[in-house]
């Protein structure tokens, strides 16, 4: 196992993902993790991530110096390399020419870490400081036009000024793999087949004959959790799907069909009337989210109580992923809340369940791979992300049954055309937003004054940042024509070309 010490880089999670993609299990902890906890994990190597600080600043992030007593190989990346240089007595200064973006790496000396790597390759730089003097015992392995010490080595300690974890670094994956396999002696034992076998055995032992309650949203995470649990405990799983009436067209039927195919009993609760009555007259986004969250808990509690009376439920399952775990102990501290997230948090006290989070070690792409391993259909697994509050946050202003129907039909057309054009899997997320404005139009010889709808499609890797998708004008024209001709009450279609930041992916 490789352990990454996080110094606050935006790329830290990519380090773990790249190594896991190579079959090497990797975890992330904050840089201030105690040496005792690090020892308990027994890593075969440490990677010190990049970060936004300067090593010579008073408030610079610095780990315990005892990491060097562990006698395991260490790789410092960007800030991590600068920390190593500073710790061992070298000199790091603010660079006159800062490096951001692509640069050419030229290997100057052979090293095991560059085994099978091209002499010259493109790498990704993102730093404002530079090393001007190496500590005693270190040698320079590679350079770039603005970094004379772009890669360094001293025995089992290595430093890279560039970011091998980002895709723009052509040989980055190979370099990380060399460190893990050739330097640290790791083996390629990580994969979803192994994870599924191990986790099913663990769940069987932990849960035994107890019952587990699992809220199913119809998304990837909760579906994979339910499938994994059912493999482990069969009918002791109680899967509950709350239909709040704010789903995409045919969504309920799609989820029911999937669970039937997986042979998992699904308790479907039709709560559309309750949700819509409570949302009546409400237009403020955060209030809509709050009402939906509270109503979900109310409906979920009622259903849970019914099953609880039949036989005590001991566990509650959630689809927590590894990024959630990492961020809960982030070196950056609590972030300002942009939007609240709908979850099953805030459940009543009588639900004193023990929490089970089978996916807490996995990234989103790994959860999809696990789903595939467990037999969940590829089509289902590749469905675009969908917010917990559903279409309520894609209808600007007050929610009504007629608006939901209008949005469902328009959204269905947009997604259908994306699939026909083989574009659906090329964009990260696509959907329609029903705007709370009307516009003047002409249909035949008549003047209309109807709703405008917005198409939104973005490219992203994890949703933290996103850029709008460049869709052909002819494609957008086709979608616009279909929506205005086939969906009653819509006479104008617009396309959102805002990236994140400054905007968010969803409108509310």
Swiss-Prot record:
SUPFAM superfamilies: Adenine nucleotide alpha hydrolases-like (SSF52402), Class I glutamine amidotransferase-like (SSF52317), GMP synthetase C-terminal dimerisation domain (SSF54810). PROSITE patterns: GATASE_TYPE_1, GMPS_ATP_PPASE. Its EC number is 6.3.5.2. It comes from the Bacteria. Residues 190-383 form the GMPS ATP-PPase domain. It is an enzyme of class 6 (ligase). Pfam families: GATase, GMP_synt_C, NAD_synthase. Residues 1-189 form the Glutamine amidotransferase type-1 domain. One of its GO terms (molecular function) is ATP binding. Keywords: ATP-binding, Glutamine amidotransferase, GMP biosynthesis, Ligase, Nucleotide-binding, Purine biosynthesis. The active site is at residues 78, 163, 165. It catalyses: XMP + L-glutamine + ATP + H2O = GMP + L-glutamate + AMP + diphosphate + 2 H(+). ATP binds at residues 217-223. Homodimer. Catalyzes the synthesis of GMP from XMP. PANTHER family: GMP SYNTHASE [GLUTAMINE-HYDROLYZING] (PTHR11922:SF2), GMP SYNTHASE-RELATED (PTHR11922). This is GMP synthase [glutamine-hydrolyzing]. It comes from Helicobacter pylori (strain G27). The lineage of its organism: Bacteria, Pseudomonadati, Campylobacterota, Epsilonproteobacteria, Campylobacterales.
């Amino acid at each position: 196992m490789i352990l990454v010490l996080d110094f606050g880089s935006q790329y830290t999670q990519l380090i773990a993902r790249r190594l896991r993609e190579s079959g090497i299990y990797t975890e992330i902890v904050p840089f201030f993790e105690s040496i005792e906890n690090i020892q308990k994990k027994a890593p075969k190597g440490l990677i010190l991530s990049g970060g936004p600080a300067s090593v010579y600043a008073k408030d610079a992030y610095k780990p315990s110096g005892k990491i060097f007593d562990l006698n395991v190989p260490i790789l410092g990346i960007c800030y991590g390399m600068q920390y190593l240089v500073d710790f061992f007595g070298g000199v790091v200064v603010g660079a006159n020419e800062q490096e951001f973006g692509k640069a050419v790496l030229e290997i100057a000396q052979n090293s095991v870490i560059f085994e099978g790597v091209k002499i010259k390759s493109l790498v990704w730089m993102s730093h404002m400081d530079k090393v001007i003097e190496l500590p005693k015992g270190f040698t320079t392995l590679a350079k770039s036009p603005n970094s004379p010490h772009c890669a360094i080595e001293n025995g089992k300690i290595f430093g890279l000024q560039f970011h091998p974890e980002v895709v723009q670094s052509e040989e980055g994956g190979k370099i990380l793999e060399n460190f893990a396999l050739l330097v640290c002696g790791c083996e390629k034992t990580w994969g979803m087949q192994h994870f599924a076998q191990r986790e099913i055995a663990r769940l069987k032992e932990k849960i035994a004959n107890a019952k587990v309650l699992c809220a199913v949203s119809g998304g990837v995470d909760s579906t994979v959790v339910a499938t994994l649990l059912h493999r482990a405990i069969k009918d002791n799983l109680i899967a509950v799907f709350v239909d709040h009436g704010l789903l995409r067209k045919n969504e309920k039927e799609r989820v029911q069909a999937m669970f039937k195919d997986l042979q998992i009993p699904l308790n479907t609760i039709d709560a559309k009337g309750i949700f819509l009555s409570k949302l009546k007259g409400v237009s403020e986004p955060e209030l809509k989210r709050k009402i939906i969250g509270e109503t979900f808990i109310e409906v979920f509690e009622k259903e849970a109580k019914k099953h609880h009376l039949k036989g005590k439920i001991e566990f509650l399952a959630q689809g927590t992923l590894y990024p959630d775990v990492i961020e809960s102990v982030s070196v950056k501290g609590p972030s300002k809340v942009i939007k609240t997230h709908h979850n099953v948090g805030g459940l009543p006290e009588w639900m004193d369940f023990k929490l089970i989070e089978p996916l807490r070690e996995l990234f989103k792409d790994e959860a999809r791979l696990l789903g595939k391993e467990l037999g969940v259909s590829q089509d289902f697994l590749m469905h675009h992300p969908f917010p917990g509050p559903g279409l309520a946050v894609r209808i600007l202003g007050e929610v009504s049954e007629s608006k939901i129907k209008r949005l469902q039909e328009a959204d269905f057309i947009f997604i259908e055309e994306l699939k026909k054009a083989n574009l659906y899997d090329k964009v990260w997320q696509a959907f329609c937003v029903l705007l709370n404005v009307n516009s003047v139009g002409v249909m035949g010889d008549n003047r209309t004054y109807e709703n405008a709808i917005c198409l939104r499609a973005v490219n992203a890797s994890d949703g933290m940042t996103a850029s709008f998708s460049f869709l052909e004008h002819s494609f957008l024209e086709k979608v616009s024509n279909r929506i205005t001709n086939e969906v009653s009450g819509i006479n104008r279609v617009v396309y959102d070309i805002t990236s994140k930041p400054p905007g968010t992916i969803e409108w509310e």
